[in-house]
């Protein structure tokens, strides 16, 4: 999604930040899913959501600096919003599961 050559980003700086945030989203999901406790998973889901917010900000900056055309920007933001909704839904589910486990 973000590593295609169609994006005309500077070689360093913003590009590295965008890549880091983009990779952090699934990396935090995977690390959290591998944890033993729901509370730990919830923590990594929160980190993943934070990385998504960071990525959104960086994409806005890239767009305003003219590195992303409006069509590409809109597509990426739309995909990122969907990812955010999925993470939010998973966070709610994990929170409910954690509450049920604590009630036992």
Language-model features: locations:
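Amphipathic alpha-helical assembly/interaction segments
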Residues: 1-104
């Amino acid at each position: 999604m973000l590593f295609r050559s169609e994006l005309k980003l500077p070689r360093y700086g913003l590009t590295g930040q965008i890549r880091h945030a983009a990779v952090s989203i699934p990396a935090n999901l995977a690390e959290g899913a591998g944890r033993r406790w729901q509370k730990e998973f919830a923590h990594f889901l929160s980190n993943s959501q934070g990385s998504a917010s960071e990525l959104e900000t960086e994409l806005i900056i890239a767009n305003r600096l003219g590195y992303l055309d409006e069509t590409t920007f809109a597509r990426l933001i739309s995909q990122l919003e969907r990812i955010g909704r999925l993470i939010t839904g998973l966070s709610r589910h994990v929170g409910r599961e954690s509450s049920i486990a604590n009630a036992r």
